[in-house]
Regions:
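Non-transmembrane, aqueous-exposed alpha-helical and coiled segments at domain scale
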Residues: 1-281
């Protein structure tokens, strides 16, 4: 049995909140640079350069890359042999978000009631937390603060099995075209296929935060990732919607078994910043 204190978890979450808001992930930085060099459009190149310059300034000055520092999504993978001491795991995570957004001077974007009492909680809590219990004594946290300019562009559809591969392609392209410039492209896109109404959205989020350039382990899905990314970049939406061939930096797919009568599909859209940090304690 391995013990981890709540204070250790709180400190880790606080640090990740600040770093995720101010430091562009390395895979995103590499992808932006690569797409900049590949662009034919001078305006698209200039736009990508502005995005890279903005990220550099943010890191140097320890300021947010974007004013929308998002709602915090926290994914915890916890081994059965781990014992949390010193309080509640859930509250330790919430306190880390609270401290990170306060001490990092990050915008507080969470309202306490979605419809009637839309008053700000003033500390960006509650975070949305998911737990995955596994064997062993691992304890891994992924933090992915998500802005809602792109979140509002995400969609789910309960396709029929008869809709097949073409139905999935059509839906993904519809979501991207509906999003257009509103998702602050170039986008990072996660596609979930299978499971159920609730599971498929989790798959899409998991796919969205997967490393840019990685592929689904099954070759047919890996090929579909490449095909969809090419189709998206042929739309001409381009960086910030100004045209060009860089509408998306990445498209990843995650899958799960599903019912014989269904084929759920979800598309999770993220802006180019794609904030995420990981730590193992």
């Amino acid at each position: 049995m391995r013990e981890i204190t709540c204070s250790t978890i709180t400190d880790a979450i606080k640090k990740m909140c600040i770093e995720a808001a101010t430091i562009l992930p390395q895979d995103v930085e590499k992808a932006l640079s690569q797409k900049h060099d590949e662009e034919d459009s001078a305006l698209a190149q200039k736009t990508l350069q502005v995005l890279m310059d903005n990220a550099k300034l943010a890191q140097e000055k320890q300021m947010p890359i974007c004013q929308d520092t998002g709602m915090a999504f926290v994914y915890v993978t916890m081994g059965q042999e781990v014992h949390i001491t010193g309080g509640s795991l859930n509250e330790a995570i919430q306190e880390g978000v609270r401290q990170g957004y306060t001490e990092g001077y990050l915008r507080k974007s969470v309202v306490k009631d979605p419809l009637f009492e839309r008053t700000n909680t003033k500390d960006n809590t509650p975070a949305i937390i998911y737990y995955d219990i596994v064997e062993g004594d691992t304890f891994h946290i992924t933090l992915a603060p998500k802005g809602f300019g792109s979140e509002n562009m995400s969609q789910i559809k309960m396709l029929k099995p008869s809709d097949g591969l073409q139905g999935i392609k059509d839906f993904v392209m519809k979501v991207v075209n509906d999003a257009g410039p509103n998702a602050c492209p170039p986008m990072v896109i996660g596609v979930g296929i299978g499971g159920s109404f609730d599971k498929v959205t989790m798959l899409a989020k998991k796919a969205m935060i997967r490393e840019i350039g990685s592929h689904h382990p099954e070759q047919r899905y890996a090929s579909l990732e490449d095909e969809l990314l090419q189709m998206i970049n042929e739309t001409g939406i381009g960086p910030a919607g100004y045209g060009g061939k860089t509408t998306a930096l990445s498209l990843n797919i995650e899958t799960f078994p599903t019912h014989i009568a269904g084929m759920p599909v979800a598309v999770s859209i993220c802006c180019h910043v794609s904030r995420h940090k990981e730590v193992s304690l």
